[in-house]
Amino acid sequence: VAKLIGDIAPQLPRHGSTQMSVHTLQGALELKELGFARVVLARELSLPEVEHITKNCGIETECFVHGALCMCVSGQCYMSAFLGGRSGNRGSCAGPCRLPFEANALPEGKPGRLHHLSLKDNSVIDKLDKLQAIGVASAKIEGRLRTPEYVAAAVSACLAGREGRAYDRDLLKNAFSRSGFTSGYLDGKIDGTMFGVRSEADAELTKKTLPALRELYRRERSRVPVEMKIEIEEGGEKLTVTDGTNKAFAYGDAEPQPARTDPTESLSRSLSKTGGTPFAAEKIDVEMDGGPWFVPGSAVNELRREALDALLKKRETLRPWPVNEVELPPLPLRTLPPHRTLRARFERWEQVPEQALSGVEYLILPIGQADRVPREWREKTLLELPRVMFGALEEDTARRIAATQDAGFAGYEVSNIAHLRL
């Protein structure tokens, strides 16, 4: 799919989402080779792991800095899909790990039905400076199914953190938390303190804080910064407005009159009155040929309105990405085998029954079991590569692949994009 998108729209930037479960350097390098411009790294990485990938992958990296954590591993969870048909790997997780579950194996006297799988929300906003320092290009907030108040609190805190300003951590916590936050993954401190549930006290604090949270965005209005340049000469006026990408012009026919004093300040004041528009004047230049010249305020206001209206129309014009006509290759026809086949997976070689060779097409065993497989069984054995390879496990897996390539095995079972490069 990635190659097809690249062939059809080569200028369209492609970002690899967290559902791709990229948590190793080799996974990020594979995305680069496929033409991706950015990879969203798994939430479970530590800061040194993020740094290693960011500094060596050759594409932009994006990291989660606030929001919900998955009890499983990013892009590897099927719990919601199996229990309710909503796949977390397709961005539709229903969050079943937040529910209480029975654990019959708990010691006697301890309650069994508890929130054994519920993690606190991740929050590493106070480490934004460290992420910036190692080259992370973008900070990501997990805000799916959250309220506007939550989004306002998280965004405000991130903006403050990015600029090195203090932010109200209590206000952020009251917007939504599960008995506090955790930074365990990024800090490399993975322990029981990462677990938390949404208590009645948490919900009550959120309710009390809602008015303050709403103030964060009640008067908010996004403004597009623009630069203006007005040029005045004896025959008339010209105003140029640009947002950095688009440029618009307006021409006036009011005959300027010689000015007794420098009109630069009054002209800038009139041009900066962009209220009622989505624009804000960030820079204003005034150029006068043979002046100083006086131009009536009404004429300047008309120039401003005309130029900003023209700029707005240009911004509203859709600019589609260039698209190539590509002939799609025909899909290969799939034919059913003449008889059913069975591929059986076992965790350890000791679990394989003696009669398995005659009853299965392939045995599947973890690659760590390779040395235990007798040579006469290897041509029917697929070696399973680990789904997750945090830390040194990626290098260890690469060594195991090199050691087993010529050992007579039927092949490997892959489950992560990084496996393609090992």
Regions found by a protein language model. Give the residues of each.
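Surface-exposed amphipathic alpha-helical tracts and adjacent flexible/coil segments at the periphery
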Residues: 1, 7-13, 29-422
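Gly/Gly-Pro- and Ser/Thr-rich, intrinsically disordered tail segments characteristic of DNA damage-repair
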Residues: 11-12, 16, 20-25
